[in-house]
């Protein structure tokens, strides 16, 4: 009798063939699941390593910068303090309280941790690389507050926050010294008390909405996720260093692609020149690009990237810089000391007041109606000598309409060509015409032009060299 093997029997009948196929499929599926499980395990381990690195970096960062949040800042009683166009005399007790309320009301955006991972990465924190983006966010937030509310608006909770105690230096001047001697260029007769808004419910709601727009979530129009995505247009990605000029162009793109503020446009100057006709087009809504022509830009944020020296800050620009910060239309300056971005909002004597984005805070879920606002406001003013400022920076101004822009240009021309200015050539120029046509894109915009000034050539470090690491 002929013997028949089981294998032959299986292949000799459709039923046997099907059973073999099922076993093979089950075996292959098992191997695939095993390999998939191993890959998932490796991915999970890599994610855990990245999270651990982020936590260690955040912890070290807060050890390095956290102590400065609680430090006392010394202010002089004999010199006025300027904060984004507002002037305060610390010889007057009520002025100190007004300054505190004004300062705390400025939006403070810092490193965050444990937010949803940035697209295409495992990064859940910007600690160590996102400081210039945060400075740009603070500048834009100030522009939105000015656009949607007013410069007089203050946060209703500002005075209820614990304000870090300052140590004003006692003035050696006699107590009877008139106010006219406390501020250069101002007399006691033209001094007017500051008018502060009482923090109406409408203002507080607008303020809360603005904070939502900057949330570290993919759906936020001005959040870190969106700005990093827009940065790819200019050759930047998450984890890269961003300079003040690149961030200016990212802010412009963020406003162009958003629907939250259709009556606001952003202009970035070319070759350190502000072209008035181009800005007038924005006021009229006559913009050749469809994405910027929505809703007739009735207000404009003007960003002017500049370089104030070679490898270090040139002190001849000190006068103009301080004069800009005295202007009510000034939105501040993004820049910083070398490899360390800061947002400058005022000055006293030869020291700049700033907000520091380097303190790392936990992610805040702004989808909740009553999300906490405290971490978006700083209660400790900091100062830095003007001479320590990095020469690469971006100035920002706001004009609500064409008439306002005309006044701004007149003021800027007086400052730029002031007899008190030590620099023969102005920081930037204002032209009546239009900029020549140029192709927008990564190649032309990722490396914005630097100012062309007469004089010997100086080796200049990259404007993107801003970070503390």
Curated annotation (Swiss-Prot):
What the entry lists under InterPro entries is as follows: Papain-like_cys_pep_sf, Peptidase_C54, Peptidase_C54_cat
Q: Name one GO molecular function term.
A: protein-phosphatidylethanolamide deconjugating activity
List GO terms (cellular component aspect). cytoplasm
Q: Where is the composition biased (Polar residues)?
A: 1-29
Name the active site residues. 131 (nucleophile), 356, 358
Q: What is its EC number?
A: 3.4.22.-
Residue ranges, compositional bias (Low complexity): 171-182
Which reaction does this enzyme catalyse, per its entry? [protein]-C-terminal L-amino acid-glycyl-phosphatidylethanolamide + H2O = [protein]-C-terminal L-amino acid-glycine + a 1,2-diacyl-sn-glycero-3-phosphoethanolamine; [protein]-C-terminal L-amino acid-glycyl-phosphatidylserine + H2O = [protein]-C-terminal L-amino acid-glycine + a 1,2-diacyl-sn-glycero-3-phospho-L-serine
Group of enzyme by EC: hydrolase
List the residue ranges forming a coiled coil, or say none.
Answer: none
Extract the ranges annotated as region (Disordered): 1-41, 169-191, 436-469
The subcellular location is: Cytoplasm
What the record says about family reads: Belongs to the peptidase C54 family.
Recorded hits in PANTHER family, A to Z, give:
CYSTEINE PROTEASE ATG4 (PTHR22624), CYSTEINE PROTEASE ATG4D (PTHR22624:SF36)
Q: What does this protein do?
A: Cysteine protease that plays a key role in autophagy by mediating both proteolytic activation and delipidation of ATG8 family proteins. The protease activity is required for proteolytic activation of ATG8 family proteins to reveal a C-terminal glycine. Exposure of the glycine at the C-terminus is essential for ATG8 proteins conjugation to phosphatidylethanolamine (PE) and insertion to membranes, which is necessary for autophagy. In addition to the protease activity, also mediates delipidation of ATG8 family proteins.
> Can you name this protein?
Cysteine protease ATG4D
Protein source organism: Xenopus laevis
